UniProtKB/Swiss-Prot annotation:
<dbReference type="GO" id="GO:0008803">
    <property type="term" value="F:bis(5'-nucleosyl)-tetraphosphatase (symmetrical) activity"/>
</dbReference>
<dbReference type="Pfam" id="PF00149">
    <property type="entry name" value="Metallophos"/>
</dbReference>
<keyword id="KW-0378">Hydrolase</keyword>
<dbReference type="InterPro" id="IPR004617">
    <property type="entry name" value="ApaH"/>
</dbReference>
<protein>
    <recommendedName>
        <fullName>Bis(5'-nucleosyl)-tetraphosphatase, symmetrical</fullName>
        <ecNumber>3.6.1.41</ecNumber>
    </recommendedName>
</protein>
<comment type="function">
    <text>Hydrolyzes diadenosine 5',5'''-P1,P4-tetraphosphate to yield ADP.</text>
</comment>
<dbReference type="InterPro" id="IPR004843">
    <property type="entry name" value="Calcineurin-like_PHP_ApaH"/>
</dbReference>
<dbReference type="InterPro" id="IPR029052">
    <property type="entry name" value="Metallo-depent_PP-like"/>
</dbReference>
<comment type="similarity">
    <text>Belongs to the Ap4A hydrolase family.</text>
</comment>
Amino acid sequence: MSTYFISDIHGCYEEFRILLEKSSFNDKKDYLWIAGDLVSRGPDSLKVVKYLYSLKDRVQIVLGNHDINLIAVHAGIKDNKKENYFDEFLSSPDSVELINWLRCQSFLKVDEKRKIIMSHAGISPQWDINIAKVCALEIEDRLSHKNYALFLKEIYHNNIDFWRLNLNQLDRLRYSMNSFTRMRYCYPDGRLNMFCKKSPDFVKYPLRPWFLMPSSISKVYSIFFGHWSSLKGTHVPKPFFPLDAGCCWGEELVMLRWEDGKWFSQAYLSKKCI
């Protein structure tokens, strides 16, 4: 029994299945942890989600910003843009069932025995582990609720970038969503920056990668995340494991087997992704 970590599949189904074959992933014995962004940009979002749905309890998923966008598009809250490649998914007779399954996924996974954490964008350096768990549960509860569309209408907000215990309920939810699915850099005071996507090679003070900020969590846990294809594994100290290698941008899909620390990779197959 092995545990594999991957992120940002982005609808690149063929590359994903080849990578599973390369790693000898066994869907009857092994476990797959996915750090979000299953869909969008690549052409086969429906195939990716249907396959993961079929794995049942063999897959552990946290949602990324593109997964949230798919749910919002399906609910009629956001426009379906061409670059999303959502048409096949939205027209599928299985779309409602799959969307409802996605809505019940997590924003944070914690394995206390192995001291492993997984989220899509990362963990706010302003949080300790207990606050992070509570904040994840709060937005998971809202997204899985039957009135989730109202939650999604209110959750998008760029100015909620600093954590305080006295945030009102809605702003608390907005901060949590921004932290789990959108951040890359922080300012020295801990404020999130959700807009800069460049490699740290090209970014100067006052911005710092969130994982280089002081944090009590990284002293205890190994942290897996995606969301940041321009990072390319550089400037990332232990115990952080970046998983987004930019397959949908013509780079590659990567996966780590936890037990022996072996990495597997599969280059994109054709210029079919955006």
